[in-house]
């Protein structure tokens, strides 16, 4: 996951010094907020003289067309428009360079992206726009999951309230880039803050249930209702690479993954018609309680001698309530 440093969050030092410091720490992107202020492009022109680091511009304006010529003169690498500010359909000239995104606040549903399907990414504002240092609103975890499901090939960027713990969760959910401002510049050093945003050892206050994929969004089978073939079909149709297998009351019996299916087929290669549920189901998967913290999750993973791609989440009486899907972590690191 890329870290996009919000350059105007450092209000104490000259811009040139901020840019030099960020480059010395090899930050991935420079995040530039333009709140209907054309003079920002003077700064962009200066930054281009000092650095080759990609520029991530967030344009907050009712009249984006007023900035098209400035964007032609000062092309940026990432260009985001704030949805709530737009008063008319956004018609972007084809010669405007850079990857395009649309930004939404916490209260705006991700469904609006259907009007911008040609764009490359969505930027989810996880705190109140313009308020530096706000707390991450955990409702945005659900929005990220929904957007990932609706637009699996699009990138997700997040701005606001991202600390070390939230950063780990976002990486796990496949977020491509996060904007960091006050957290980055209020730390004892930029280097320490960057380490906190990218390291695997973190403090934790969020629980697994805050960011897991809930059971009602997972492929689910019931052992007494489904044959082995039907379970394989559920895995295939679910497009997540697994299915939870439950009892009538919702208690977890096991999990069937694509890897488990391959093992079952190899086991009964000469008599495929004899494959039954027990041949393809892992009846003792690694699970975690919904009330566990991120730190407890990491400690559990460290005890494993095998790679963990899926981890069912259960409640205190063993009922399946969701799953942690580590496949998205790979997307977030690309």
Predicted feature descriptions by range:
Residues 1-78, 86, 114-119, 164-165, ...:
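Conserved N-terminal beta1-alpha1 strand-loop-helix module at the mouth
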Residues 254-259, 321-329:
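Short hydrophobic beta-strand motif reused across regulatory alpha/beta modules
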Residues 44-50, 83-169:
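Short loop-to-alpha-helix "cap/lid" segments that border enzyme active sites
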Residues 79-87, 123-135, 172-195:
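Glycine-rich phosphate-binding active-site loops on the catalytic face of alpha/beta enzymes
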Residues 6-13, 59-64, 103-111, 155-165, ...:
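Glycine-rich beta-to-alpha transition loops that act as phosphate-gripper elements at the mouths
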Residues 204-219, 274-285:
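Bateman (tandem CBS) regulatory domains
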Residues 4, 30-31, 56-58, 78-80, ...:
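Conserved beta-strand positions in the central sheet of alpha/beta enzyme cores
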